[in-house]
Amino acid sequence: MALTAHPSCLLALLVAGLAQGIRGPLRAQDLGPQPLELKEAFKLFQIQFNRSYLSPEEHAHRLDIFAHNLAQAQRLQEEDLGTAEFGVTPFSDLTEEEFGQLYGYRRAAGGVPSMGREIRSEEPEESVPFSCDWRKVASAISPIKDQKNCNCCWAMAAAGNIETLWRISFWDFVDVSVQELLDCGRCGDGCHGGFVWDAFITVLNNSGLASEKDYPFQGKVRAHRCHPKKYQKVAWIQDFIMLQNNEHRIAQYLATYGPITVTINMKPLQLYRKGVIKATPTTCDPQLVDHSVLLVGFGSVKSEEGIWAETVSSQSQPQPPHPTPYWILKNSWGAQWGEKGYFRLHRGSNTCGITKFPLTARVQKPDMKPRVSCPP
């Protein structure tokens, strides 16, 4: 009986071999003795992610981009300070500019609306649990969604926030309509991007949201198709607030009340596969945030190598490595991307601007707490 391997496994092996020789800008014709390996890796990429191209010229163009992105993944691997792994992803045949146009949004956030803010600066800092993962509460987090070519991460993050709060607060397992947020948005730009508060304003204006079942996602804005009173509302919000730009406070709130939305710089995500991203402000500017996601937990991981780092002095004893603290984030690019649709960012260094817009809806009175505690 012949042995077979899944395309993703073969692709990983081929890419690992190619990466050993990649150190600079790369095109298909620059590979010298390696063109067959590159072409085979690209063929497996097409099979795994169901890619086809309209002409030989387009195929050659995408092959060049694929080769360039292999080199870029290698550079990211060398620059990252965490445990992240970069390589072939569903977006490996896109240029950085194309990826940004499809999934990022660079609108200046000067129009931040007036909203409530969490004011706790005079209170002593409370302890934060070692870890918190709302995914471990049965059905608390709705399934991973795929925004496809509609740049609506802002709407999907807001919908995920509302769904989760209803699930952990009231045991009401609803999936709310992202399409209603797109069709009825009065502040956002639909599939051209927006901010999470745009979605929350629409929810307040519409007195709630219909279900995903009644008002399903179409992947595009439908002009003159906003019918906020046509379908029964299954979830609504009291208001929304901006949390303090402090990772300790964000962790406290997350563990106590549930997942929140954050808006980050998505630059390292195009070629991300798994692990904890720890980028520097130079490689991932915390001021240039362009992608909204749902923050669902936090924890720590030991050094992947599992070895003790030697100190500068040869006479000193080796010291155990410090654990790497991380945030767990739910993305909206489908379950084939990242860690089954999730990813992790370093916690404690404002990686990729995670503290810039920590925003959440509220679906209950401020003095009430959810009926469920966040499991470690």
Curated annotation (Swiss-Prot):
The protein's role, per its UniProt record: May have a specific function in the mechanism or regulation of T-cell cytolytic activity. (Microbial infection) Plays a role during influenza virus infection in lungs cells ex vivo. Acts at the level of virus entering host cytoplasm from late endosome.
Organism classification: Eukaryota, Metazoa, Chordata, Craniata, Vertebrata
Top-level taxon in the UniProt lineage: Eukaryota
Keyword Ribonucleoprotein: no
SMART domains in the record: Inhibitor_I29 (SM00848), Pept_C1 (SM00645)
Short name of any one Pfam family annotated for the protein: Inhibitor_I29
Enzyme category, top tier: hydrolase
Annotated glycosylation sites: N50, N205
GO molecular function: cysteine-type endopeptidase activity; cysteine-type peptidase activity
The UniProt record lists the keyword Hydrolase: yes
Active site: C153, H291, N331
Residues that make up the propeptide removed upon maturation: 22-127
Gene Ontology biological process terms from the UniProt entry: immune response; proteolysis involved in protein catabolic process
Signal peptide limits: 1-21
GO cellular component terms attached to this protein's record: endoplasmic reticulum; extracellular region; extracellular space; lysosome; membrane; platelet dense granule lumen
PANTHER family in UniProt: CYSTEINE PROTEASE FAMILY C1-RELATED
Localization of this protein: Endoplasmic reticulum
Tissue and organ expression note: Expressed predominantly in natural killer cells, and in cytotoxic T cells.
Keywords: Disulfide bond, Endoplasmic reticulum, Glycoprotein, Hydrolase, Protease, Signal, Thiol protease, Zymogen
Protein name per its UniProtKB record: Cathepsin W
EC number: 3.4.22.-
InterPro entries: Papain-like_cys_pep_sf (IPR038765), Pept_asp_AS (IPR025661), Pept_his_AS (IPR025660), Peptidase_C1A (IPR013128), Peptidase_C1A_C (IPR000668), Peptidase_C1A_papain-like (IPR039417), Prot_inhib_I29 (IPR013201)
Organism: Homo sapiens
Disulfide bonds: C150-C191, C184-C226, C284-C352
Family: Belongs to the peptidase C1 family.
